Amino acid sequence: MHQVLDAELLAASERRGGEPARVLDVGGGSGVWSVPLAAAGCLVTVVEPSPNALATLHRRAEDAGVADRIVAVQGDTDALGDLVPAGEADVVLGHGLLEIVDDASAALSALATAAAPGGAVSVLVANRYGAVLHRALAGRLVEARRLLDDDTGQLAASGEKVQRRFDAAELDLLLVGAGLVVEVLQGQGVFTDLVPASELDASPSAAEALQELELAAAGRSPLRDIAARLHALARRPH
């Protein structure tokens, strides 16, 4: 997914005549995505409801020397239209967002509205079938069956923050329903959580081989469909 994002951000900068790409990171938390993007030269606005997360973001940005490239806005996704201008962001990020909001469809529509015409929306979500597989392999068979049978991919009454998980078809329909054109729908973490750490430690070349395998498998169904996460890049039409 990093290659996809890097290519999109480069194209956005070129469309601006070499000026920095403008990124909106919704639910951006403590800056896991925004700080590296700012360090790469982007101008980033982060919308995040948690003041504690924003405080951590500020410290991270200061430490990285990119505080002047990040604007932090405290607020919820359902108020996004009141917090940021519509149609201005070259790339809108919703990474780890759609699983925890009350209304995933409304949230995605808000992300689409914030994107400039021709701009992109990048979403990263928990994969329902990946969660089923990982729990089964860990011996948590009852949880695996509950996740498989639940329409939202949620472990009801478990106290987990996640309200839903997605499969590839559901995510595609959600993006199209928000008026976006899906260009990339790939898996992230097909094998990484399954390969024993001892195997990676045993060979100096194993980590590189795993990365190459992940890249090769990311867009191939059915391997994509059992990844830990699903990443999509969708475009707002002109």
Segments predicted by a language model, with ranges:
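Conserved Class I S-adenosyl-L-methionine
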Residues: 184-238
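Class I SAM-dependent methyltransferase SAM/SAH-binding core
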Residues: 32, 36-79
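A conserved beta-strand element that flanks and buttresses the S-adenosyl-L-methionine
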Residues: 93
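Conserved class I S-adenosyl-L-methionine
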Residues: 19-27, 120-149
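Conserved alpha-helix/loop element of class I SAM-dependent methyltransferases that forms part
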Residues: 1-19
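A short glycine-rich, Lys/Arg-flanked "PGG" loop and its adjoining helix->strand segment in the class I
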Residues: 105-120
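Short alpha-helix
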Residues: 162-179, 185
